[in-house]
């Protein structure tokens, strides 16, 4: 069975940090051979199971899913290097 890996970037309207994090996330994926998909969504439009499981109050928030199970979430911006470390630690690479 193939493992499905997704990273959701939860955003909100007018969030400059969200736009910065989106650029970093997409650049990290482009610069590496990662097979996860990236989904950028306003927090109100996230899948219901994410909105039920996580109380999102700060943005941007990255949500790491494996087979539709939340493995990890982190709020705020970070460097590309830090994001790569998280991806490696979670075996999302």
Task: Describe each model-derived feature in a short phrase.
Residues 58, 63-93:
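Non-catalytic, surface beta->alpha helical segment in thiol-disulfide oxidoreductase systems
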Residues 32, 52-54, 90:
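Residues at alpha-helix termini
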Residues 43-59:
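Short Fe-S-cluster ligation motifs
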Residues 16-17, 45, 78-81:
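Short alpha-helical
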Residues 1-34:
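Local sequence-structure signature of Cys/Sec-based thiol-disulfide redox active-site neighborhoods
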Residues 36, 44, 51, 75-77, ...:
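Alpha-helix boundary/capping detector
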Residues 10-12, 33-48:
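Thiol-based oxidoreductase modules, predominantly thioredoxin-like and allied folds used
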């Amino acid at each position: 069975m193939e493992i499905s890996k997704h990273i959701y970037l939860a955003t909100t309207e007018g969030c400059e940090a969200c736009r910065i994090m989106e650029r970093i996330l997409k650049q990290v994926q482009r610069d590496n051979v990662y097979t996860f998909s990236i989904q950028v969504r306003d927090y109100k439009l996230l899948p219901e199971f994410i909105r039920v499981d996580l109380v999102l109050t700060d943005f941007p928030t990255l949500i790491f899913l494996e087979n539709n199970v939340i493995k990890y979430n982190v709020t705020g911006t970070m460097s590309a290097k830090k994001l790569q470390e998280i991806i490696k630690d979670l075996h999302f690479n």
